[in-house]
Amino acid sequence: MARYTGPSWKVSRRLGISLSGTGKELERRPYAPGQHGPTQRKKISEYGLQQAEKQKLRHMYGLTERQFKNTFNKAGKLQGKHGENFMILLEQRLDNIVYRLGLARTRRAARQLVNHGHITVDGKRVDIPSYQVSVGQVISVREKSAKNSAIAESLEVSSFVPEYVTFDAEKLTGSLNRLPERSELAAEINEAFIVEFYSR
């Protein structure tokens, strides 16, 4: 399944989550596209709930089905809770860390920064969005990209940086100083549904 590249607001309204990070797309019309007003939806089956939860998280991080499933399988080989490990692995993706540092306003924009070679890891350019960032690694904006307008605009509006990352706005460098705890990740996601979905 290819990565969705259409309007994010449509997916946000269909799944009931904000993919832009602002929540604005849900303020005016907090119901699915195609509905003529906030009419009551049909009752969803257990399978439907599980699938919807999977789609929420997949679109949140902007992954293809194959990338999502591969990461899920990788999480299953780690010690601890499968669902929590899965969410932590998603959070360790380079494009996500770039987003968390405030260098991009959305994960989609962060993915483009990585793809276009604007980001380095420990001084070496990395253009793979799925690269898994380890604790202690230094993420930086390339010197040639320091005046990138998209980065500058994002830094102007970004204020919240999670406690598990550190960022130096003057040097445009940051790092993952520890793995996140479950309580610091998306509260609107029930990862148990996703584990159940793939266990069918």
UniProtKB/Swiss-Prot annotation:
Residue ranges of domain S4 RNA-binding in the record: 92-170
Keywords, alphabetical: Ribonucleoprotein, Ribosomal protein, RNA-binding, rRNA-binding
One cellular-component annotation, GO: small ribosomal subunit
Location of region: Disordered: 22-43
A Pfam cross-reference name: Ribosomal_S4
Keyword rRNA-binding: yes
Biological process according to GO: ribosomal small subunit biogenesis; translation
Gene3D superfamilies, sorted: Ribosomal Protein S4 Delta 41, Chain A, domain 1, RNA-binding S4 domain
InterPro entries in the cross-refs: Ribosomal_uS4, Ribosomal_uS4_bac-type, Ribosomal_uS4_CS, Ribosomal_uS4_N, S4_RNA-bd, S4_RNA-bd_sf
GO molecular function: rRNA binding; structural constituent of ribosome
UniProt record similarity statement: Belongs to the universal ribosomal protein uS4 family.
HAMAP family: Ribosomal_uS4_B
Oligomeric and partner information: Part of the 30S ribosomal subunit. Contacts protein S5. The interaction surface between S4 and S5 is involved in control of translational fidelity.
PANTHER family named among the record's database cross-references: 30S 40S RIBOSOMAL PROTEIN, SMALL RIBOSOMAL SUBUNIT PROTEIN US4M
Function recorded in the entry: One of the primary rRNA binding proteins, it binds directly to 16S rRNA where it nucleates assembly of the body of the 30S subunit. With S5 and S12 plays an important role in translational accuracy.
Name this protein carries in UniProt: Small ribosomal subunit protein uS4
Organism: Listeria monocytogenes serotype 4a (strain HCC23)
Taxonomy of the source species: Bacteria, Bacillati, Bacillota, Bacilli, Bacillales
